[in-house]
């Protein structure tokens, strides 16, 4: 065992001072007809939790995990997996996520890498068969190794393109074997630094072909999981092709791929794109493209992807409001693509961080559900757009008018009165619901 001094993390209620207990996340509590566990579908990110060592551009790693001390790739990978499943079980999460290089280091050749992956896939499958934990999604890392300096599916080098395709093929084989509910593409190197040396048209066409081949291969092997694309505007590449939800949806529509994909949206990526997280969620939902989320938060004083654990209750409320309005998760869930801070190097910090994130989204779920149940925000919106329910507004909405009719109407109705947007009232309403939820939270486990 790697976490000998830590037991099962259980729900103890809002008054608990136990740092190894949930205060608000009660997996069995019903909210809006489903349990919290069914709504939230929490997942742990393998890379940040078990691979990361705290290294940053200015300093060496600070996190010396016992499971990463072995030298042989497979020995280390198996120890890491044992630590991971001990963590999953004690935390009580139903899912995990990984990149291929997270579960085992690359070998000296692609063939050796695949041999390692085959052995580790079998090892993980055995562990999953004796556990309640399942695979939410997996993906191929096509951004870390120097071979991807010019991209993977958008590389100017066809040999790199073929190598990346081989990695995705193996990734889909693993997804099929482990019963993944989704498969993710994140194009960290799919973009460009300067147009001076870039054939954008060719790169976008090659990228679309890459996705199409993945869809075809999945169909061939019988993998029926949901394909997801994770937008990000920049970092590590200056201009990334999957900039945000709208850009990614436009790309998929342009190349006839929209029916095969949904989006995996990350809060910190929305920040980098100049959007709120709820904006990205709303855009995806409007196009029936909301698949899953990576839960984290950024630091507005910094300009990069800090991947902090989500503790902002207000943001979690607004995110869950959009998710519930869209019908909730189907194959997706809430993956904590978040890392403990570099000075938080103790193993127990991993538990504290996930407990905080899970409690945050539990509060977000309860408040959002109550807002929707009470239709607390609906009245203001209905009043604001009331002019489109009758007269000329209804004609506009139903497409029964034209510029000439509208011009004639405007000439006869040029005394215009607008109504208040009531932003402050709405924000106060959200605050009230949030504070009430915290006030009403059961003090102890026995209270329901």
Swiss-Prot record:
Chief location: cytoplasm
Molecular function GO labels: magnesium ion binding; xylose isomerase activity
Catalysed reactions listed for this entry: alpha-D-xylose = alpha-D-xylulofuranose
UniProt EC number: 5.3.1.5
Pfam families in alphabetical order: AP_endonuc_2
Entry binding sites for Mg(2+) 1: 230, 266, 294, 337
Cofactor detail note: Binds 2 magnesium ions per subunit.
Cellular component annotations (GO), alphabetically ordered: cytoplasm
Binding locations of Mg(2+) 2: 266, 269, 305, 307
UniProt keyword terms in alphabetical order: Carbohydrate metabolism, Cytoplasm, Isomerase, Magnesium, Metal-binding, Xylose metabolism
Top EC class of this enzyme: isomerase
SUPFAM superfamilies reported for this sequence: Xylose isomerase-like
Disulfide bond annotation, renumbered to this chain: none
Residues spanning the signal sequence: none
UniProt KW Transmembrane keyword: no
Keyword Cytoplasm: yes
Location relative to the cell: Cytoplasm
Family recorded in the similarity comment: Belongs to the xylose isomerase family.
Subunit structure: Homotetramer.
Protein name, entry field: Xylose isomerase
UniProt source species: Bacillus licheniformis (strain ATCC 14580 / DSM 13 / JCM 2505 / CCUG 7422 / NBRC 12200 / NCIMB 9375 / NCTC 10341 / NRRL NRS-1264 / Gibson 46)
Gene responsible for this protein: xylA
């Amino acid at each position: 065992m790697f976490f000998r001094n830590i037991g099962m993390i259980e729900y103890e209620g809002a008054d608990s001072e136990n740092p190894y207990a949930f205060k608000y996340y009660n997996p069995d509590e019903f909210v809006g007809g489903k349990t919290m566990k069914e709504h939230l579908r929490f997942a742990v990110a393998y890379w940040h939790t078990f691979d990361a060592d705290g290294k940053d551009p200015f300093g060496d790693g600070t996190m010396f995990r016992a499971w990463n001390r072995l030298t042989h790739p497979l020995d280390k990978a198996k120890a890491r997996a044992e630590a991971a499943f001990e963590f999953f079980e004690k935390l009580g999460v139903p899912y995990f996520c990984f990149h291929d290089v997270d579960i085992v280091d690359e070998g000296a050749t692609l063939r050796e890498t695949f041999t390692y992956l085959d052995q580790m896939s079998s090892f993980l499958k055995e562990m999953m068969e004796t556990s309640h934990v399942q695979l939410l999604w997996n993906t191929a890392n096509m951004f870390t190794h120097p071979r991807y300096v010019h991209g993977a599916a958008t590389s100017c080098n066809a040999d790199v393109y073929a190598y990346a395709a081989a990695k995705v093929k193996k990734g889909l084989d693993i997804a099929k074997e482990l019963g993944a509910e989704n498969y993710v593409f994140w194009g960290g190197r799919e973009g460009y630094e300067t147009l001076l040396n870039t054939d954008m048209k060719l790169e976008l066409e090659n990228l679309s072909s890459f996705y199409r081949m993945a869809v075809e291969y999945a169909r061939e092997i019988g993998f029926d999981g949901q394909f997801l694309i994770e937008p990000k505007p920049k970092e590590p590449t200056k201009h990334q092709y999957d900039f945000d939800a709208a850009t990614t949806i436009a790309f998929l529509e342009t190349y006839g791929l929209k029916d095969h994909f949904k989006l995996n949206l990350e809060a910190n990526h929305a920040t980098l794109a100049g959007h709120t997280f709820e904006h990205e969620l709303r855009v995806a939902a409007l196009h029936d493209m909301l698949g899953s989320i990576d839960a984290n938060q950024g630091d507005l004083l910094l300009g990069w992807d800090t991947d902090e654990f989500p503790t902002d209750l207000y943001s979690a409320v607004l995110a869950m409001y959009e998710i519930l309005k869209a019908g909730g998760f189907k194959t997706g869930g809430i993956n904590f693509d978040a890392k403990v801070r570099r000075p938080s190097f103790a193993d127990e910090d991993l538990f504290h961080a996930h407990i905080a994130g899970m409690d945050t989204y539990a509060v977000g779920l309860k408040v959002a559900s109550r807002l929707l149940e009470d239709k607390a925000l609906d009245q203001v919106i209905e009043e604001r757009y009331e002019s489109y329910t009758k007269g000329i507004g209804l004609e506009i909405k139903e497409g029964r008018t034209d510029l000439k009719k509208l011009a004639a109407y405007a000439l006869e109705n040029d005394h215009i009165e607008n109504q208040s947007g009531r932003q402050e009232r709405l924000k106060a309403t959200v605050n009230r619901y949030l504070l009430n939820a915290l006030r009403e939270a059961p003090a102890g486990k026995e209270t329901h």
